[in-house]
Amino acid sequence: MIDPADLPNPPEGVILCDWQTALEDHSDLFKTHLQSVIPLDQHKVSAHHYRHLDRGLFIYVPDETQVKDWLELTIDLSQGAHQQVLLVMGRNSRLTLVESLYNQTTARASQTYLAEIILEEGAQLDYI
């Protein structure tokens, strides 16, 4: 599980939380979009990923929300071998997401990372 204290403060109106919090506080929204782009049974790799998934982030940008500053995420892959970000952008929303991935371990192991991104009509995402 991701420690909420490790997450950056989200821009006003934006939801940014770990998956446990998403299930508790935003269940309908979260469940509607999870696996809508990358289904469990799409491929052997996605099946492997979901079977071993141990950490995740949920980001929701509501309709008509224009985020002026970028949202920066630093993902430590050494904290969980199979991680995922679910990003849902509402109609006519805008966001710049800057994402950094790193791993501090030298151990050889299977790892997967998925970014499942849903853009509603008119949504604009700059993904760096």
Report each predicted region and the residues it spans.
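Glycine-rich and polybasic anion-binding loops at the starts of cofactor/ligand-binding domains
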Residues: 1-128
